[in-house]
C-alpha cells in the first residue's frame, strides 16, 4: 500500500489555485484547536479534582463520623477518617499534575504555531509573487495578441492599397506595417520574458509547496503523537488515582477486619457498668392495715419489727459510790 503523503496529494491544475495548501492549513488549524480543547479539558478536570479534594478534606476534618464509638470500631473509624483525608490529598495532587499536563500542551501548541508561522510567511510571499507574475504575464500576452492583430490589419491594408495611385498613402501604410511588425517583435519578446519569469516563479512555488507539505506533515505527525501520548498519560493518571484510592481504602478494610463485636461489648460493660443486683420488687401496702398497726409516737415503727421483752431493772448497789439510784436523780441543784 502506497503511503499517502501531503506533497503528492494537494495540487491543483489551476496555477492560481491554493486549494490544496488551504486544505492543509485548515486541517492544521483544526488540530491546533483540538489541542486547545483538550488543554481546556485538563484545566477544567483539574479544577474539579481540586474542588472535590478540598471538599472531601473539609468533610473528613470537620464533619463528625461516629465520634462516640469505642474500642476496636473507634480505631477503624480513625483509620477511615485518615484514609479519606489521604484520598482527598491525592485528588489535590492529581489536580496539580493535570495542570502541569495542560501547561505542556499549551507549550507544544505555541511551539508548533511558531514553526508554522515561518513556513506560512514563505508560502504567503510566494503565492503573492506567483499571482503578480501571472497577472503580468497575462497582460503581456494580451498586449502581444493585440500587436499581432494590429500587424495583420496593417498587412491587409497594404494589400488592399496595391492599386492606389497615391504613393504617399501607400508609404504611410508601409510605415504603419513596419511599425506594427516592430511592435509585434517587442511585445513577443516581452511576453516570452514574462513566461520565462513565471515559469521560474512556478518552479520556486512548487519547491516551496513541497517543502511546506513535508514540514506540515511532519508537524501533524508530531501533533498526533503528542496528543495521543497526552491522552494516554491522562487516563493513566486517572487509573493510578483509582489504584491509590483503593489501596488506601484497603487499609480501612483491614482495620475493619480487626473489629471485634464481643470486645467492644465487653469494653463498654467494663467502662460503664453500674451494678449486678437488680432492684427488689415493690410490695403492695394497704393503707388501712397500716393505720391499725400504728404505734404511739416515740416508739419505733416499721414493717415486721420483732417485739422486745421488758427492759431489765438494775439492782441497787448502795455500796457503789459511782452508782446512783433513780430516786436520787433531781433536776434541781442542791
Swiss-Prot record:
Q: Which PROSITE patterns match?
A: F_BAR
Listed transmembrane segments: none
- InterPro entries listed in its UniProt record: AH/BAR_dom_sf, F_BAR, FCH_dom, PSTPIP2_F-BAR
What the entry lists under SUPFAM superfamilies is as follows: BAR/IMD domain-like (SSF103657)
Summary of the function given for this chain in its UniProt record: Binds to F-actin. May be involved in regulation of the actin cytoskeleton.
Q: How does it sit in the membrane?
A: Peripheral membrane protein
Kindly provide the PTM information from the record: Phosphorylated on tyrosine.
Q: Which gene encodes it?
A: PSTPIP2
Task: List each coiled-coil range.
Answer: 66-166
Q: Name one GO cellular component term.
A: membrane
Q: What is this protein called?
A: Proline-serine-threonine phosphatase-interacting protein 2
Q: Which UniProt keywords apply?
A: Coiled coil, Cytoplasm, Membrane, Phosphoprotein
| Region ranges (Disordered) | 295-322
Record localization:
Cytoplasm; Membrane
Question: Which residues are modified to Phosphotyrosine?
Answer: 323, 329
Q: Which domain of life is it from?
A: Eukaryota
Instruction: Give the Pfam families listed for this entry.
Output: FCH
Tell me where in this chain the F-BAR domain is found.
4-264
Amino acid at each position: 500500500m502506497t503511503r499517502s503523503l501531503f506533497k503528492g496529494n494537494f495540487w491543483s491544475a489551476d496555477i492560481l489555485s491554493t486549494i490544496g495548501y488551504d486544505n492543509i492549513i485548515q486541517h492544521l488549524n483544526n488540530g491546533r484547536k483540538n489541542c486547545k480543547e483538550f488543554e481546556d479539558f485538563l484545566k477544567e478536570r483539574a479544577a474539579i479534582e481540586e474542588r472535590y479534594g478540598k471538599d472531601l478534606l473539609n468533610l473528613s476534618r470537620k464533619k463528625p463520623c461516629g465520634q462516640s464509638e469505642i474500642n476496636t470500631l473507634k480505631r477503624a473509624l480513625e483509620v477511615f477518617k485518615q484514609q479519606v483525608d489521604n484520598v482527598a490529598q491525592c485528588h489535590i495532587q492529581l489536580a496539580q499534575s493535570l495542570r502541569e499536563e495542560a501547561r505542556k500542551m499549551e507549550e507544544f501548541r505555541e511551539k508548533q504555531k511558531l514553526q508554522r508561522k515561518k513556513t506560512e510567511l514563505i508560502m504567503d510571499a510566494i503565492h503573492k509573487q506567483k499571482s503578480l507574475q501571472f497577472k503580468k504575464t497575462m497582460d503581456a500576452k494580451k498586449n502581444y495578441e493585440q500587436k499581432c492583430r494590429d500587424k495583420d490589419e496593417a498587412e491587409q491594408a497594404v494589400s488592399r492599397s496595391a492599386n492606389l495611385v497615391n504613393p504617399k498613402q501607400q508609404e504611410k501604410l508601409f510605415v504603419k506595417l513596419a511599425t506594427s511588425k516592430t511592435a509585434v517583435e517587442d511585445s513577443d519578446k516581452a511576453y516570452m520574458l514574462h513566461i520565462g519569469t513565471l515559469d521560474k516563479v512556478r518552479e520556486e512555488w512548487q519547491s516551496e509547496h513541497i517543502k511546506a507539505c513535508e514540514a506540515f506533515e511532519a508537524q501533524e505527525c508530531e501533533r498526533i503523537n503528542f496528543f495521543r501520548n497526552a491522552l494516554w498519560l491522562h487516563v493513566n493518571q486517572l487509573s493510578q488515582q483509582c489504584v491509590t484510592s483503593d489501596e488506601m481504602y484497603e487499609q480501612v478494610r483491614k482495620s475493619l477486619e480487626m473489629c471485634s463485636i464481643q470486645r467492644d461489648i465487653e469494653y463498654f460493660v467494663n467502662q460503664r457498668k453500674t451494678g449486678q443486683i437488680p432492684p427488689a420488687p415493690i410490695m403492695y401496702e394497704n393503707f388501712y392495715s397500716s393505720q391499725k398497726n400504728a404505734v404511739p409516737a416515740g416508739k419505733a415503727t416499721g414493717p415486721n419489727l420483732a417485739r422486745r421483752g421488758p427492759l431489765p431493772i438494775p439492782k441497787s448497789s448502795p455500796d457503789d459510790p459511782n452508782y446512783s439510784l433513780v430516786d436520787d436523780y433531781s433536776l434541781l441543784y442542791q
